[in-house]
Amino acid sequence: MSQEKISEIIKDISALKTSCEKLNSQLDELITQKVENEMLLEEVKVLEDDSVLHKLVGLVLVKEEKSKCYDTISRRLQYITGEIENRKKVITNSEEKLRKLFSDLEAHAGQRKIPVPQA
């Protein structure tokens, strides 16, 4: 295996690690949004049915009925939960690709007696 191939594998590992870091950051943000929306949903649940709520749309407060607000938050939670699951799948796939790249690198470095850099 040539030095170019090893350099290419190292470059792929670096790019994939950067991608994984970005995905983990996005996952953290989605989990935070989910927790915030779950708290909001619990607060809306305890309100009386005829309560009038207000939501901020741009710079304007708009009246909204409790049922509509509850439905909106529930749909948002479903969407966020789906996005969390998607990110977890992508992260898992990326981690598997990383493991494969590391094993390829170790195999090629072992053939050439080159120490594997710790990434």
Swiss-Prot record:
GO terms for cellular component: cytoplasm; prefoldin complex. Possible candidate for an effective malaria vaccine as determined by epitope response in sera. InterPro entries: PFD_beta-like (IPR002777), Prefoldin (IPR009053). One of its GO terms (biological process) is protein folding. The keyword Secreted does not apply. It holds the Pfam family Prefoldin_2. Transmembrane segments: none annotated. Gene3D superfamilies: 1.10.287.370. Keywords: Chaperone, Merozoite. Binds specifically to cytosolic chaperonin (c-CPN) and transfers target proteins to it. Binds to nascent polypeptide chain and promotes folding in an environment in which there are many competing pathways for nonnative proteins. Heterohexamer of two PFD-alpha type and four PFD-beta type subunits. May interact with MSP1. Belongs to the prefoldin subunit beta family. This is Probable prefoldin subunit 6. It comes from Plasmodium falciparum (isolate 3D7).
